[in-house]
Amino acid sequence: MANNPGAKKAIRKIARRTEVNTARRSRVRTFLRKFEDALAAGDAAVAKAAFIEAQSELMRAVSKGVVHPNTGSRKVSRLAARLKKLDQAAA
């Protein structure tokens, strides 16, 4: 249990930060799910728009420290590869 005021404040800050980070992580997952749905539907135009949104959201999470930079880059790279594969199949 926190005994001094600084430790109590740290607990409050951590609780707020955890809530914000959870929301950000959830938001990233939502955009990734939208991209997955667009890929499953096979619609290249919708998938490209969803990819741009997902990439933006992932990089925002990276900049906020919610996701490790390498993880964000890896996910974006894999999404781009899947989008490219869909484009090539459609062409």
From Swiss-Prot:
The entry's keywords: Ribonucleoprotein, Ribosomal protein, RNA-binding, rRNA-binding
InterPro entries: Ribosomal_bS20, Ribosomal_bS20_sf
One example of a Gene Ontology biological process annotation: translation
GO-annotated cellular components: cytosol; small ribosomal subunit
One of the record's GO molecular function terms: small ribosomal subunit rRNA binding
Family: Belongs to the bacterial ribosomal protein bS20 family.
Main function: Binds directly to 16S ribosomal RNA.
Protein name: Small ribosomal subunit protein bS20
Organism annotation: Caulobacter sp. (strain K31)
